[in-house]
Curated annotation (Swiss-Prot):
It comes from Dickeya zeae (strain Ech586). One of its GO terms (molecular function) is ATP binding. InterPro entries: GK/Ca_channel_bsu (IPR008145), P-loop_NTPase (IPR027417), PhnN (IPR012699). It comes from the Bacteria. Pathway: Metabolic intermediate biosynthesis; 5-phospho-alpha-D-ribose 1-diphosphate biosynthesis; 5-phospho-alpha-D-ribose 1-diphosphate from D-ribose 5-phosphate (route II): step 3/3. This is Ribose 1,5-bisphosphate phosphokinase PhnN. Its EC number is 2.7.4.23. The gene is phnN.
Amino acid sequence: MARLIWLTGASGSGKDTLLDALRQTEPVRLLVAHRYITRPAQAGGENHIALSEAEFAYRREHNLFALHWQAHQYQYGIGIEVDHWLSAGLDVVVNGSRSHHQQAQQRYGSRLLPVCLQVSAAVLAQRLRQRGREDEAQIALRLQRADAMDILPATCRRLNNDGPLAQTLQAFHTLLAAEKSDFWQISL
């Protein structure tokens, strides 16, 4: 059974870096889905498909999103194409939302594999400063939000990203292999 890997983590935890690295590795039945966002493509951050508010609303009205939500003054969507990819037996990883995990759980049930990317507060603060998108007040708010969102669903698989990217990639692939093995043992 193919899974929807719902990757979440605080802003600055390294989700975009991990997703970019996954796009560069040989796809072993794993696709990385782009999000549709009402944010300009050149705004920095993740590799996404930029839509106007009108385009987003049109797609939503025509059921072209498997999931969609609003956060940080933008609209976010996961295209309905992920359902086709899952039906074809491919695992799909998406940049999910901690606040909208329940919405994904309701739609995908046992096919949902939540993975929570975690970093220490010190590493998170350092990364937020290095990327230069937020001022100190905004960084303080992001750190506060990360701390408040640290209560994760019981089903969430934790993935530490304090170390080098290669280490996180290896841990991610190990986690997926273990989850696939556990699934087949339970299903037999």
